[in-house]
Swiss-Prot record:
Gene3D superfamilies linked: 30s Ribosomal Protein S14, Chain N (4.10.830.10)
Keyword Metal-binding among record annotations: yes
Originating gene: rpsZ
GO biological process: translation
Positions with a binding annotation for Zn(2+): 24, 27, 40, 43
Pfam families membership: Ribosomal_S14
UniProtKB keywords: Metal-binding, Ribonucleoprotein, Ribosomal protein, RNA-binding, rRNA-binding, Zinc
Cofactor field: Zn(2+)
NCBIfam families, per database record: PRK08061.1
GO CC aspect terms: cytoplasm; small ribosomal subunit
Entry note: cofactor: Binds 1 zinc ion per subunit.
Name of the protein described by the UniProt record: Small ribosomal subunit protein uS14
Length: 61
């Protein structure tokens, strides 16, 4: 889990727009966040496999 202080810092509006960055809405992870879902790759996989994300299916070919 991410530190609460860092999550609060990311939620506040930065002085300059370039400093803004995305965090996972579920766990607060700063890396590999999918903008479309607002989730990191780990949370996205967990929720997709549990069937909590409508329209997302496991790929097979």
């Amino acid at each position: 889990m991410a530190k609460t202080a860092l999550i609060q810092k990311a939620n506040s509006k930065p002085k300059f727009g370039v400093r803004a960055y995305t965090r996972c809405n579920r766990c607060g992870r700063p890396r590999s966040v999918y903008r479309k879902f607002g989730l990191c790759r780990i949370c996205l996989r967990e929720m997709a496999l549990a069937g909590q994300l409508p329209g997302v299916t496991k790929s097979s070919w």
